Amino acid sequence: MGRYSYTKALELLTEWANNEGYDDITFDHNDISYIDWVKKSLNIPKKIRIEGKYPVEIKVYILLHELGHHQLRKNWDSFTKKLPITAHAEHVHFFKNDTKYKRRVMYTVSCMEEEFKAWEEGYKLGEELGIRINLDKWNTFKSKCLISYMRYYGSKR
C-alpha cells in the first residue's frame, strides 16, 4: 500500500461539493474557513472558503466539516427538526431582519450543537467517500475548533 494522497482527497471532495452546487471553493483564504449560501437562503449552495495556513490533510478535515454543515442544512425540513432553535432564529433574522432570537442563550447553545453535528456529518461523509481520516489528528483539530467556537459564542454573552 502506497502513501495516501490528501491532495487527491481534496480533489474528490471538491468534485463532490461541485456536484452539490458549490462552484466557488478556495483553499487559500486568509481568514477563518466558512461555508456560504445564496443570499436570502439558508441552504442553497454558494461558496466555501478554507484557510490557506493549514497543511493539505487538515484542509481535507476542514472541508469535511464545512460539508457537514451542508449535509445538515440541505434538507431544510430535516434541519428544522434537528436544530429547531437555530432554524427559527436564522429564518427570522434573514427573512424579517429580526435579531432578537440570535441574542438568546438557546440560540448560542443550538449553534454549538450544529458545530458538533457538522463534525459528525463531515466524518460520515469522509467514510462514505473512502477518505482516510487519522483519528488522532481529526479529534485534535476538531477539539481545537470546538473550543474556539465555545470561546466565540461565550464572548457574545
Spell out what each predicted region is.
Residues D36-S41, T80-A87, F116-W119, Y123:
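A broadly tuned preference for mixed-charge, low-complexity surface segments
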Residues P55-I58, K100-R157:
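Long, well-structured alpha-helical subdomains associated
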Residues L67, F79-T80, I85-A87, M150, ...:
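General N-terminal targeting signals
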Residues R73-E114, N139:
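Post-HEXXH active-site segment of zinc metalloproteases
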Residues R3-A9, T14-K59, L67-K74, F79-T80:
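Active-site scaffold of zinc-dependent metalloenzymes
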